[in-house]
Amino acid sequence: MSAHLEAVTQPKLRFAWLWWALGWLLVAATINESLQRNVWPVAKIMPSDKVMHFSGYCLLAIWFAGVARRSRYLVVGVFLILLGGMLEIAQGMMSQGRTADWWDFLANSLGIATGLGVAALGLGNWMVWIEQLLRPRN
């Protein structure tokens, strides 16, 4: 792992590279879903578009809070807010049935704040706990 990545990663994670890779796959899936026309079945079961935005960004915040050091939560939050904002702007520039909705951006931001708040209250070490549970016992 690079020195820069080590500086932002929780020191107790044995499989940090895997957690980061899976997190970036979640970001890629979020980008794809945001720019496509509701291709995922989850869009059909959510009670509201805003609930989907809130839930998705809350999940991203909790995910990256699990892999990042607590001192980097602000960076995680800023990155995710910028991602949500840029995707809304991109949707506004598209001509294929997607439109920018700043209420979506608000739902994203509230999801991020909730996810990071939950992480700061104690859930931030969830990846460490999973690795400890999966560690072979002698």
For the regions a protein language model found, what residue spans apply to each?
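Bulky hydrophobic segments
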Residues: 2-103, 109, 113-138
